[in-house]
Amino acid sequence: MRFVIVTGMSGAGKSLVTKYLEDIGFFCVDNLPPALIPKFAEISAQSEGKMEKIALVIDIRGGELLHDLFPALEEVKKSGFSYEILFLEADDDVLVKRYKESRRQHPLAPEGRLLLGIREERKALQTIKSKANYIIDTSTLVTRQLKQEINGIFLEGKIFKGIIINVVSFGFKYGIPTDCDLVFDVRFIPNPYYIAPMKNQTGKDQMVKEFVLNASETKEFISKLDGMLDFLIPNYIKEGKSQLDIGIGCTGGRHRSVAIADEVYRRLEEKMHSVVIEHRDIEKDGKGVGK
């Protein structure tokens, strides 16, 4: 049985995450009093496989009840069940903006002092955050990216090694993704855009893929990138980095970067990393621009 506690800052996306967990088969319960968690775990374990994946949403609305959380989880552990904690985070200014847009009242700001309430909540949740298995900062994530993060951690068949790796292909014509930690420019690789049969294809098509990946420049680049990532990823994990965003760019983001990003994704998956792929500009019309 997989038993997950979902918690974090109000406004950081717990409702969305709950929906995404339900989409991948989790039975979700919102704001269960911590004192009831051990009994709930016991009942879930006796459900004869009907409740194999459980997510409990615990937040500041529980007030003083939050103090009961870790004693309850310790009891769960003593009963032979393991658990994971997912903590959702966001910057203060982002949370303020979200609250103002939604016109909701923060649970710790009854008199409307929103920023003060957010800071009080952050302080109250610090201990829980320090014990979290996974921390996702949603400050700059769009909903699709948040779903990718959740799938990367919780989809069956993937092993979480302490870091989520996002690989994104893009076109320099449309700008470099602002959230990338590593950016690789693959415009030095022979360009299939200028070969008539491949001009209107993408790096997803077999002809383009073979052309790009069979180039001697690509083979050498992939080999060196492989070694670089094998070195970097364990060191990022050691330093506590929980997310790595890798951008691979060509001119228009439809040919070379797509084929190479897919190959990088495939190799990382083979090494059992939690990895997601995005082709940001593959659908964009880049007439007259080499890809």
Swiss-Prot record:
InterPro entries: P-loop_NTPase (IPR027417), RapZ-like (IPR005337), RapZ-like_N (IPR053930), RapZ_C (IPR053931). GTP binds at residues 59-62. ATP binds at residues 8-15. Keywords: ATP-binding, GTP-binding, Nucleotide-binding. GO terms for molecular function: ATP binding; GTP binding. It comes from the Bacteria. Belongs to the RapZ-like family. HAMAP family: RapZ_like. Displays ATPase and GTPase activities. This is Nucleotide-binding protein Ccel_2290.
